[in-house]
């Protein structure tokens, strides 16, 4: 049985944690930042976690 290929687009966007949860970066932080408050931009730098509903599907894209 061949190994499952990793979805390269998903591998660049998500990382698995040691406990098996999936870490993600937040959207709306790349451009058009002048109209956003410093507090909002600061919070966009923090990492988020993928919801339980989507974890199973993304785990199949990044198996290793």
Swiss-Prot record:
Cleaved signal peptide residues: none
Similarity field: Belongs to the bacterial ribosomal protein bL35 family.
Record carries keyword 4Fe-4S: no
HAMAP family given in the database record: Ribosomal_bL35
Source taxon at top rank: Bacteria
Molecular function in Gene Ontology: structural constituent of ribosome
Lineage: Bacteria, Bacillati, Bacillota, Clostridia, Eubacteriales
Keyword presence, Ribosomal protein: yes
SUPFAM superfamilies in the record: L35p-like
GO BP terms in the entry: translation
Keywords attached to this entry: Ribonucleoprotein, Ribosomal protein
Organism field: Syntrophomonas wolfei subsp. wolfei (strain DSM 2245B / Goettingen)
Region (Disordered): 1-48
Listed PROSITE patterns: RIBOSOMAL_L35 (PS00936)
Protein name according to UniProt: Large ribosomal subunit protein bL35
Entries under InterPro entries matching the protein: Ribosomal_bL35, Ribosomal_bL35-like, Ribosomal_bL35_CS, Ribosomal_bL35_sf
Record's GO cellular component terms: cytosolic large ribosomal subunit
Biased composition annotated in UniProt, kind: Basic residues: 1-26
Pfam families cross-referenced by the UniProt entry: Ribosomal_L35p
